[in-house]
């Protein structure tokens, strides 16, 4: 199995578009937090939207909107590199007309959930992650799965509880929200598999759909994390031949 950085994009350890967007999301959140502290008022999705529009510039695309260009990440030449960004993220950001407005599409792809991990370390993680993912993904599954992911990470960070227990608590808090049905169903399913001792492998993961949409990516990532008793075991899962578009795990 893989034990070190693998060659990609002509070098070892090059970051993907997923990582690029996660970094720009974190930059937007930090700027929003500072603005909130300084002024007492801030529309977080709008500030994150500025950051994602700066990422769009690094991909060689001039957005319709005019984002603030004084960010730190945009000054890093290594990030001015086109990877393989998803069409939904590109088109939603290219077509945006108002900062902070949700995307006008019905996509539930994993391009929202894969970038919201930084939301776990800021106030109101579920709401902030959902609103951030909704900037590019308009289907409730696309953005509510992102909210649940950030909420789970936040609870793991704040509470010394097993992952399975944290997932149950997060579902109790948010699983009944309108539009959460697909995500709740799939996450509850992998919880049952874990409780029954069923471990993930490439074939079983493929049966879940492969992780190309948000609820699948989250459920697969949680299943692998639940099954891995150690970092080494998790590494084996990641190198078992499974490939998806998402970096949720």
Question: Where are the regions a protein language model picked out?
Answer:
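Structured, active/binding-site neighborhoods that engage oxygen-rich ligands
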Residues: 1-249
């Amino acid at each position: 199995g893989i034990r070190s950085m693998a060659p990609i994009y002509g070098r070892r350890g090059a970051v993907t578009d997923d990582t690029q967007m996660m970094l720009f999301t974190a930059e937007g959140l930090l700027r929003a937090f500072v603005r909130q502290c300084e002024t007492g008022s801030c529309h977080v999705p709008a500030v994150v939207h500025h950051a994602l529009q700066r990422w769009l510039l690094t991909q060689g695309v001039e957005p319709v909107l005019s984002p603030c260009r004084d960010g730190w990440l945009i000054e890093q030449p290594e990030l001015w590199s086109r990877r393989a960004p998803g069409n939904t993220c590109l088109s939603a950001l290219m077509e945006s007309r108002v900062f902070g407005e949700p995307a006008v599409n019905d996509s539930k792809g994993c391009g929202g959930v894969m970038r919201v991990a930084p939301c776990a370390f800021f106030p109101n993680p579920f709401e902030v992650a959902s609103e951030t993912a909704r900037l590019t993904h308009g289907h409730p599954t696309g953005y509510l799965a992102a909210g649940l992911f950030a909420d789970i990470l936040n609870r793991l960070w704040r509470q010394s509880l097993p992952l399975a227990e944290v997932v149950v608590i997060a579902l109790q808090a948010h699983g009944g929200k309108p539009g959460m049905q697909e995500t709740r169903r799939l996450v509850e399913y992998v919880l049952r598999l874990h409780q029954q001792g069923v471990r993930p492998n490439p074939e079983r993961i493929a049966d879940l759909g492969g992780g190309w949409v948000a609820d699948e990516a989250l459920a697969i990532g949680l299943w692998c994390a639940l099954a891995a008793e150690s970092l080494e075991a998790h590494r084996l899962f990641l190198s078992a031949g499974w490939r998806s578009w998402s970096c949720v795990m």
